Amino acid sequence: MERTDRWGRIYRRRQAEYVTSFPSLLDYFGFVYHFPGLLGGPNTYYREYHDVMNNIRYPSGKLPATRWRAVLLNLAKGCFFLALFVVGSLYLPADFLLTASFADRSLARRVLRLYLTFLAVRCRYFGLWKLGESLCILDGFGEETKDGVSQWTGISNIDIWAFETSSSMSAATRAWNKRTQKWLQMCIYERSNFNQFYVFMVSAFWHGFYPSYYLCFGLGSLLQYANRLTAIKLWPRVKGTWMETPYLVLGNVCVMLVGSYMLEAMFNYSFERAWLGWKQASFFGVVFLFCGIVLLWFIPKASREGKDKRD
């Protein structure tokens, strides 16, 4: 019954994306080389692209005027974050993290510099995604209706606030590159029963063949595992108590710092440069995760009785 319900949910989610007729070469290449999609990744699925371009979604051929607010807002966000990226690249160059001068600093200063450097790097993605989102909305893609209100959030690739304030790896993953995440979920993850490590390795393979990608996503699977342990063993103890907010804040700090350590590997591409970058940071991300996981193994699960009382 559980398996039947699972496939039923998967089937219903996919219905909206079904392609009812085989696309012509013109339609296919028009979708593949659609400029807003090239700029920010394929933000929309072929079904939506086809329906908008052929006046099926908007039979009159006139696009809703309500989209202009979302177009201008995302355009402003895109320009703002790209400006932050340019400034950050000047004052926080990533290559400095590989130098002896960086390694000579205290661990606290190195960790802070690492975080700020890759915060600036993330701004590049924030900016490009928001520009691509703005152009897609201008073309009529991404309209959703929630509670009877039209919203232009259907092609959003990033929830910046949710990502930067996430207190777990799973929350950060859901907020980052959302359209690709949805595609991978529909086409791969929901069709398999493999573990979390497999999921992260598929993501690494999707990005490319640089060895550093597999270091990055391998560490990401460990961070996800650590988050699952804390959710099972710690979260029931603090939920609904005065410790809930400190727990979430500490979780956010851990995810952002270890996440920045992961990104250092990803953006160094070769194994040698990635390993050097981790070494210059004293392998703090790896040591922190392994020590945290071992410690969590020895913490007993919260009693069901105590959890029920708090709930």
Q: What is the predicted function of each stretch?
A:
Residues 1-311:
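Non-catalytic, membrane-anchoring transmembrane segments at the edges
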